[in-house]
Amino acid sequence: MSSSRSNNRATCSRSSSARSKHSARVVAQTPMDAQLHAEFEGSQRHFDYSSSVGAANRSGATTSNVSAYLQNMQRGRFVQPFGCLLAVHPETFALLAYSENAAEMLDLTPHAVPTIDQREALAVGTDVRTLFRSHSFVALQKAATFGDVNLLNPILVHARTSGKPFYAIMHRIDVGLVIDLEPVNPVDLPVTATGAIKSYKLAARAIARLQSLPSGNLSLLCDVLVREVSELTGYDRVMAYKFHEDEHGEVIAECKRSDLEPYLGLHYPATDIPQASRFLFMKNKVRMICDCSATPVKIIQDDSLTQPISICGSTLRAPHGCHAQYMASMGSVASLVMSVTINEDEDDDGDTGSDQQPKGRKLWGLMVCHHTSPRFVPFPLRYACEFLLQVFGIQINKEVELAAQAKERHILRTQTLLCDMLLRDAPVGIFTQSPNVMDLVKCDGAALYYQNQLWVLGSTPSEAEIKNIVAWLQEYHDGSTGLSTDSLVEAGYPGAAALGDVVCGMAAIKISSKDFIFWFRSHTAKEIKWGGAKHEPIDADDNGRKMHPRSSFKAFLEVVKWRSVPWEDVEMDAIHSLQLILRGSLQDEDANKNNNAKSIVTAPSDDMKKIQGLLELRTVTNEMVRLIETATAPILAVDITGSINGWNNKAAELTGLPVMEAIGKPLVDLVIDDSVEVVKQILNSALQGIEEQNLQIKLKTFNHQENNGPVILMVNACCSRDLSEKVVGVCFVAQDMTGQNIIMDKYTRIQGDYVAIVKNPSELIPPIFMINDLGSCLEWNEAMQKITGIKREDAVDKLLIGEVFTHHEYGCRVKDHGTLTKLSILMNTVISGQDPEKLLFGFFNTDGKYIESLMTATKRTDAEGKITGALCFLHVASPELQHALQVQKMSEQAAMNSFKELTYIRQELRNPLNGMQFTRNLLEPSDLTEEQRKLLASNVLCQEQLKKILHDTDLESIEQCYTEMSTVDFNLEEALNTVLMQAMPQSKEKQISIDRDWPAEVSCMHLCGDNLRLQQVLADFLACMLQFTQPAEGPIVLQVIPRMENIGSGMQIAHLEFRLVHPAPGVPEALIQEMFRHSPGASREGLGLYISQKLVKTMSGTVQYLRESESSSFIVLVEFPVAQLSTKRCKASTSKF
């Protein structure tokens, strides 16, 4: 499917790279940003913002303009005057660059009139260490050797001459180290990187508030966040600003001073926040402007440097002229902007291990704070806000995932209903019935152009206009299967202007060479609701000429005047799926018209494919059961009544209760009293489809374990479901916490004898580490060394977060920033004296193996009760359990894949079957000969047999012999002839004749029972015999021996013996064994025989396989009640077929 977008980016399915699409948007927007920047620099006071945005969208900048623009954005030559900047060589600390105000701020400016030979106090090449007191330059030198210097920020330093304190905030650039120096307010208690706990305490209440909010309410989450940030920082206005799919922005939450105009609901064009600025927000999460009207300070640098130094990561970076003017126009003097990043969308490539790969980040939005007077926020408070935003990012990740899942579920439900309609009336039914195609994706109208007729829903173009669109698609997009665009104008459709704003966006799919389905969307502005006052021409922003939120809004409306809301990837996937179903349905319909019998011949192979899929699923399931039974972790399961139906060997070993004694007992009877409510909660949640995690239950002990006290388990509950997704029970995957609780009790009793625990060589001791109140490792026990691959000497004295567990290529790497944020919350919560929840924590060890664990942390105190750090335990599943869980995931995935495949096959086969039935209905009233009527009757029976097989989704009921059997009146000979017809293609191909041999009464015998199942089993046995018979060996004989029995005066039972005889040696013995004893490794043929044998048994019959010297035979013994005996003359049948 081709696509057309206003910014030339492709609309593709989720299997395409989301990262590539974002790159395309960046490439498209950057020249527009550069064009606007060039126009602003060239026009200054006469710059007309609204019209320039529209012009930039229509024309691009030259390559040289783009390069100059990016250079200016990333390598500006000015800083804000509230601090000073130093750039140094990373090894020698020789000065490479400095801001002009550095000498004055560091009190290096000479007070006397300088002489000619007096040396400058600060110059390129100066050893920066000489500018600070000894303890300060030692701290700077140590930080320079650290892998990630950002983790050590801020470093408290003191000027050598005056002793004035500064926060030194360091980051690396291509030529060395940049040091931002911010003066410390004497009334504030100075902190360093080790004072991160203080920063955490500042935001602790806000973090707890965010984490306590219910999921599924993004608006509430954003409202709470802006209020918390407002209380923390004191800014006059705080806004949550979200980037949409097409890169434009929207204010979705706001907390402001009552006298300020609201900006809630205001939309901004993508160019309002240039892509270069967004890149800077990804690099430097916090951007502070203390006074936009302050004169910026120039940076002086070494002439030998080939280009200006990069100040992307510097908080001191001065605002550009256009941004300063924008702030001034809206009455804002100071600002604080913090980025909100989330995990990038993962490509749906089917890689089962993708969830264990490190994830990239993308910019979701910004937290924007404005103040009407100059305002400075010290680093500790900025760090607290940044940490709060990281927590918010984790919450947003959850909300984005939940929203995507909800949307997919809605689309899948709608697709299912649409497929059902298609079976009755394709493709018109999806327009004439409810739900319809407009329920599949959000749109304002839809149209079906099919066989030169038109069906429409909602707001659509006229019939003539739709025909013009069809002609345009056939002429200019004939090579594609469809087109999607958010702007027909920019897609090049010549009649777009005539459509007005009613139809701007369109998704079209081709369901045949001349037939189309359309979805239409109106212009974006219709969706926009702004909470602010409406714009009046007499307002102070000069009718949109100045840069102001109002002019941004006006520019945005101008940009989207001919554009609709973009088509999301998940929506295009749904549309594309419907297209495939429709195309397949229409092709099958055409094929059935040309060849009515073709589908019947291929049906058995589809059936075997279904059975093969279930066989593979059964094999995986059996392997999973074996692993669970032998796992070294306790695993148990209950049915929906709460009775035990699974109890593995480890559970039996820990409790002393054997498997056979546990099965059938209520779980609540096996737990101690204080765990009864927990078990009931888990079961109630499971019945609602909610899976509880990390809950503690205590099991009673029995027999030889009775004196050891209860077994303490940390359990995760997994809902067990059948193929229809109905919850049928709960499986508990547990960790034995008894040993850890013993250790924790001992730890509590000894009150600080930590070393005795950590260095204990007992295998009961789990992986343990300790940190001090600064976040550095103090202890790292042997179990931690084994699981992480990091030796004790390499962990001790290292920062736990940043050096040991990291997002970089050294230490133990975690999947994403969110994991480190959660770990930081856990450590800070403990050290601040609170009781934290256990943390599900995953990381890659030094061998690259992904480890999943449950982390428990508790505070460490000294003799006076002062908190000195944290003691942490890791609970890791055994390799056997990890493998079992992996197999379980594979099993669930295989089950879902098989279910989807089977559903698709069953769905697709119904269409040709319906076509065949329709053809049959046309033929029945015709004047047919007796022979033709018999052929038609056999054809009907084949179709009905195939339909019966397609409804077999519960093989377990067949195996247990309680599948439902039909009861109909049928003619036995017609059923037998149908069996022979099914074998004819294979018989003719192998040139093996099939003889039939049955007495005269069979032809006129009408019985009562399930004729279709009888046909199925006899046809399966016959096909198996044909497979293992060679042409030269002789014919196959289908023999029927009936015996009638009178039951009372009015009822007869027909005892039937079917003998299917073929020449020796016959069917291999291994296959016959598979027929009677199902095994996980059974072949397709063996599984077919096994199912047929079970069906015969369900009919109260038996199957035998007899080997003789000359021949071998399947012998099927069944009985049916006689419905009636025909009075017409019966003839014996002994002919060849």
From Swiss-Prot:
Chain ranges of the GAF domain: 217-400
GO biological process, one term: red, far-red light phototransduction
Key words, A-Z: Chromophore, Photoreceptor protein, Receptor, Repeat, Sensory transduction, Transcription, Transcription regulation
Record domain Histidine kinase: where: 904-1124
Region annotated Disordered, chain positions: 1-27
Positions bound to phytochromobilin: C322
Changes after translation: Contains one covalently linked phytochromobilin chromophore.
GO molecular function: phosphorelay sensor kinase activity; photoreceptor activity; protein homodimerization activity
Xref: Pfam families: GAF (PF01590), HATPase_c (PF02518), HisKA (PF00512), PAS (PF00989), PAS_2 (PF08446), PHY (PF00360)
InterPro entries for this protein: GAF, GAF-like_dom_sf, HATPase_C_sf, His_kinase_dom, HisK_dim/P_dom, PAS, PAS-like_dom_sf, PAS_2
One of the record's GO cellular component terms: nucleus
Transcription regulation recorded as keyword: yes
Assembly mode: Homodimer.
Function (record text): Regulatory photoreceptor which exists in two forms that are reversibly interconvertible by light: the Pr form that absorbs maximally in the red region of the spectrum and the Pfr form that absorbs maximally in the far-red region. Photoconversion of Pr to Pfr induces an array of morphogenic responses, whereas reconversion of Pfr to Pr cancels the induction of those responses. Pfr controls the expression of a number of nuclear genes including those encoding the small subunit of ribulose-bisphosphate carboxylase, chlorophyll A/B binding protein, protochlorophyllide reductase, rRNA, etc.
Similarity comment text for this entry: Belongs to the phytochrome family.
Name assigned to this protein: Phytochrome C
Organism: Oryza sativa subsp. japonica (Rice)
Gene name of the record: PHYC
